Amino acid sequence: MRYFYDTEFIEDGHTIELISIGVVAEDGREYYAVSTEFDPERAGSWVRTHVLPKLPPPASQLWRSRQQIRLDLEEFLRIDGTDSIELWAWVGAYDHVALCQLWGPMTALPPTVPRFTRELRQLWEDRGCPRMPPRPRDVHDALVDARDQLRRFRLITSTDDAGRGAAR
């Protein structure tokens, strides 16, 4: 199963602190959560302007501990299932680190969770940079961005048998 995801985070060149994560499965399921453990005081001006205002109110049940987000993702990704898990993100290096850190060190990742994220931006370039529709108006909301990544994947791979050859 392919999973398209995005994270919002605070980074200072030394650490990456998860703010929120959105994941969209190819079968239409969606997951979104905001970490109760990030420190908004550490956010730079860009994150304060473009990310924090888009978060749900702190009383929302979408705000969850990192431990609960990890448990939710284990269920959402069906880590005990038989389908292989493919993670996809647009320029996903920091997203992958933010995701993996939910389990602690990378060695603590469940065996079925990939140690890498497939790069949607690279796939787009490899396919000749096909024209994409404009980004949604509410970008930098992790779930909105994850939905947009699935849409982009489908557009990029629409000529190769419904995307089955995307990872070649």
From Swiss-Prot:
EC number annotated for this UniProt entry: 3.1.13.-
Cofactor note: Binds 1 Mg(2+) ion per subunit.
Domain of life (superkingdom): Bacteria
SUPFAM superfamilies in the cross-refs: Ribonuclease H-like
Keywords: Exonuclease, Hydrolase, Magnesium, Metal-binding, Nuclease
Region called RNA binding, residue ranges: 6-9
Pfam families linked to this entry: Rv2179c-like
SS bonds (residue pairs): none
Top-rank EC class of the record's enzyme: hydrolase
Regulation: Inhibited by EDTA.
Gene Ontology MF terms: 3'-5' exonuclease activity; identical protein binding; magnesium ion binding; nucleic acid binding; RNA exonuclease activity
Binding site for Mg(2+): D6
Role, per record: Exonuclease that cleaves single-stranded 3' overhangs of double-stranded RNA. Has no activity with 5' overhangs. Has negligible endonuclease activity. Can bind ATP, dATP and AMP (in vitro); the nucleotide occupies the predicted substrate binding site.
Other comments on record: Member of the DEDD group of RNAses that are characterized by the presence of four acidic residues in the active site. These residues are conserved even when the proteins have highly divergent sequences. Has high structural similarity to RNase T despite very low sequence identity.
Subunit structure: Homodimer.
Protein name: 3'-5' exoribonuclease Rv2179c
Lineage: Bacteria, Bacillati, Actinomycetota, Actinomycetes, Mycobacteriales
